[in-house]
Amino acid sequence: SGRPSPTKAEHVIEDLGDKIDCIIDGGDAEIGLESTIVDFTEEIPTILRPGYYNKEMLEKVLGTVRVDPGILAEDSHVRPKAPGMRYKHYAPKADLTIIQGEMERVIPEINRLAAEQEKAGKKVGVICTDETREQYTTGDIKSIGLRAEDETIAHHLFAILRDFDEDGVEVIYSEAFDTPRMGQA
């Protein structure tokens, strides 16, 4: 669909509509990120699509693991083997900018950018953490959880992006998240 992956039954309904007869709703997705796809057809397992389970986690169980060169290749002629690796495959409808750095600089910068965009008539979304939420002043502000909890951040990511799509958000500013357990996902 080109949209962020479904994390709730209603997302599946939006994406697939009348193409399926039934949806079994087991609640929200536990992780909220794409699944890791690993190719076991070669001697050394190869990650075809990074997801929650990163290379280091897999190597603890499998030994040596390669990463498909197409995943990180800057050359557009080197294609990844797995689905879901195209440039905008899981992108939200809105333009997304991630602001990295020290939080005492990131927060005022996001507030400034969001205010500029709102002044220009754009609907703005902000992705932050529980720790910084109260410091944001402009836009549809959504917390992704506690900064130290990789799993919570992973769980909420696609759901927040889809919420912004549903709300008609045109520009998203997000804090950067240091989430080593999420790997390249």
What kind of region is each of these model predictions?
Residues 1-185:
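Active-site-adjacent structural elements in enzyme catalytic cores
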